[in-house]
Design a protein with these regions (language model features):
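A generic structural micro-feature
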Residues: 5-7, 67, 83, 97
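HotDog/MaoC-like acyl-thioester-processing domains
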Residues: 83, 92-138
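Catalytic strand-loop segment that frames the active site of acyl-thioester-processing enzymes
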Residues: 2-40
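Short, conserved micro-motifs enriched in small and acidic residues
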Residues: 39-47
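Hydrophobic beta-strand-centered segment that forms part of the acyl-chain substrate-binding groove
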Residues: 53-88
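Generic structural detector for well-ordered beta-strands
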Residues: 12-18, 76, 120-122
Length: 138
């Protein structure tokens, strides 16, 4: 972790929603989801927020030896976004507590605010983390 990783860090990311990030594609094997509207799925939205936070942090850690993993999410999904619209995600690093990072998140699709919330990540040593995961497979 570098000294530049401090509260107040902001980052913005834009992402055009493709059809394969809509609700029916979240779990293609789930027949119930196949009947749902083709709008950005909350699960994919969470992934987009994680991706944005990763991009925000990576210049400030020893990537790829250090990485961050999600440990908490608290958000509202406020409006539906159809494919073709661009989601603008703005994150702000609110707190650095050792290796724990807390971000505030606001996202819009150019028409509506689609989400507000917080996301927590934890800085890991990638080699040690991957070794522990491999041990679970044994």
């Amino acid at each position: 972790m570098k000294d530049s990783l401090k509260p107040g860090l902001t980052y913005q990311f834009k992402y055009e929603v493709p059809e394969d990030k809509t609700v029916p594609f979240l779990y293609p094997e789930a027949p119930e989801l196949q009947q749902m509207p083709k709008v950005l799925a909350t699960g994919f939205m969470v992934g987009l927020f994680e991706w944005t936070c990763i991009q925000a942090v990576n210049p400030h850690i020893d990537w790829p030896d250090e990485q961050t993993v999600g440990i908490g999410i608290n958000l509202n999904h406020l409006a539906a976004t159809p494919p073709g619209l661009t989601v603008n995600v703005e994150v702000k690093l609110e707190e650095v507590d050792g290796r724990r990072l807390v971000f505030s998140i606001v996202a819009d699709d150019g028409i509506d605010t689609i989400s507000k919330g917080t996301h927590e990540r934890f800085i890991i040593d990638a080699a040690k983390f991957n070794a522990r995961v491999a041990d679970k497979r044994k």
